[in-house]
């Protein structure tokens, strides 16, 4: 027996303590067989390679008809290339077939170590056939097989990783399929508004969810207010045109500088599906508006508009500008110029009022053409939402100044025309007075002559 299986009984031959040598030989055989089931050939990670003499048909039980592995693979390829031949063209009952193999193995499993070795080899070949049917023979390497056998480190069931690869003869995935597969692998889904979110277990992160609350930079100590920063706003700071790095983003979010501050921030963003690579460089110039969150920038624009409306001396400025051109020949031309300027300014205001740049937790539907909307969105992203409302407030103030200029010119023209009319009427009355006196004197003289 030692000459036939020298590698299986060497442990039993070195024992000389008088124990049952056949029992020790059987234990050594079981240990060798157990080690051989986890060893794979270097040629194929999922193929159990042995010599032809070890798997001769006399070593199998009589109730099982052994089919070599290459015949099984040929039968599998023929069935899949001609699905009309096989009743189960889509391998829906592959699990049922594997259970039948398992029952056949255990029903006819021998007790001696030779048939035990052959039975374990048959189990390995059945597992290879099942993996072929599941479409993972050419898609995974040896370490992937160990992940499928014991469960992956990502907490997924092994069957969830059995995805068909391009080596199985399937059609290449298009751009949409590739994007969908990447989103599925990364756990990223798209909400109804087009925002990028990532699945975390069973919960779904919404871009409108609160990321943190930030104290204002421009508020006084007596009236400090906090502004809510959403996940969508953080994503806008990390995206073009700014592409802020971890240091600048930490400054905006008022995070204290620490040794691992950048790494902690990147890990938190990664859990939310946002990528902030280490060593990133900013893409835009840093201004004072860069340090403001969108809530504070909007608050600043609103206060600026209120101050312009209530405190700017629009009447005094308009009258001062109108008095510079009070000549009679220039007043008509000035009125036409002011009316044309008011019309152009109104058109500009109407355009800015239709801006639908994403801001805060809102992502409105665009109204303008995308050619002009993308430029307005770029300006809004650079100014953190301050730019467009501030310009609208300035244009409204300018409209008020133009209206005051027009009112002053019309009032002055009316006053001049009224004075000229009054002076002309007085001159006519003064010319008619001597005539009345002469006629009255003539009438008196006529009366005296009649009496005489």
Curated annotation (Swiss-Prot):
GO terms for cellular component: nucleus; transcription regulator complex. Pfam families: TF_AP-2 (PF03299). The modification Phosphoserine is found at residue 239. Keywords: Activator, DNA-binding, Nucleus, Phosphoprotein, Transcription, Transcription regulation. Its main location: nucleus. Residues 280-410 are annotated as: H-S-H (helix-span-helix), dimerization. GO terms for molecular function: DNA-binding transcription factor activity, RNA polymerase II-specific; RNA polymerase II transcription regulatory region sequence-specific DNA binding. GO terms for biological process: inferior colliculus development; negative regulation of neuron apoptotic process; positive regulation of DNA-templated transcription; positive regulation of transcription by RNA polymerase II; transcription by RNA polymerase II. Signal peptide: none annotated. Residues 416-452 are annotated as: Disordered. Residues 429-452 have a biased composition (Basic and acidic residues). The keyword Transcription applies. Expressed in both embryonic and newborn brain. It is found in: Nucleus. Sequence-specific DNA-binding protein that interacts with inducible viral and cellular enhancer elements to regulate transcription of selected genes. AP-2 factors bind to the consensus sequence 5'-GCCNNNGGC-3' and activate genes involved in a large spectrum of important biological functions including proper eye, face, body wall, limb and neural tube development. They also suppress a number of genes including MCAM/MUC18, C/EBP alpha and MYC. Belongs to the AP-2 family. Binds DNA as a dimer. Can form homodimers or heterodimers with other AP-2 family members. This is Transcription factor AP-2-delta. It comes from Mus musculus. The lineage of its organism: Eukaryota, Metazoa, Chordata, Craniata, Vertebrata. The gene is Tfap2d.
